[in-house]
């Protein structure tokens, strides 16, 4: 099996926005990557899409995605209309787990679990070489295990999910909370984002720790 990456392209998701606009962006990115690889869409037998949330790969529908703010998104149908080739969709962490199983750190294993960290926390489970999705296609949504009773609110609507604490989104929210504390005289964290709290990223607190910001250390210690 050929597993070499031969071209890359990317763009910002910029959610929330309409499904059609996101599909337009994904189609553009796919075509750019194909062009970089010196191929055409006619050379492509199929395209795979990895998406956070509960994904039904049989129907091609994203049933629910907390991070993309969509319900019952018919992504396969919409993308096939744009690219005129076979499209497959799977939960992003499931796809990552399968990739590790086929060609990565889990190659040669019978069973595997992968955990992805980014905007949220995802999980993928491989059993006997096959993706385990569970009865509701959310069997490996490890980020939505409740670790703190009545804890921080999560994007999924529950409270105390692991994702609310340990994802990049959780870190950004924690950084903002520390910046906004009362009697906060000076913060390298705030200075590094030009005084605009909306510019806080997952790197803000780490960069501030290296600059000697004690409040940033508090953020990292809690994270």
Feature-to-residue mapping (PLM):
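Short beta-strand-to-turn element immediately C-terminal to the catalytic PLP-Schiff-base lysine
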Residues: 99-100, 124-128, 132-134, 146-148
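Glycine-rich phosphate-binding loop plus the immediately following alpha-helix
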Residues: 89-93, 147-184
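A mobile "lid/hinge" subdomain adjacent to the ATP/sugar-phosphate binding pocket shared
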Residues: 166-223
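Phosphate/pyrophosphate-binding loops at sites that engage ATP/ADP/AMP, CoA/4′-phosphopantetheine
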Residues: 26-47, 86-87, 181, 185, ...
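Glycine-rich phosphate-binding loop and adjoining helix at the ATP-binding site
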Residues: 13-27, 43-47, 53-111
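Gly/Thr-rich phosphate-binding beta-strand-loop-beta motif of the actin/hexokinase/Hsp70
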Residues: 1-6, 114-131
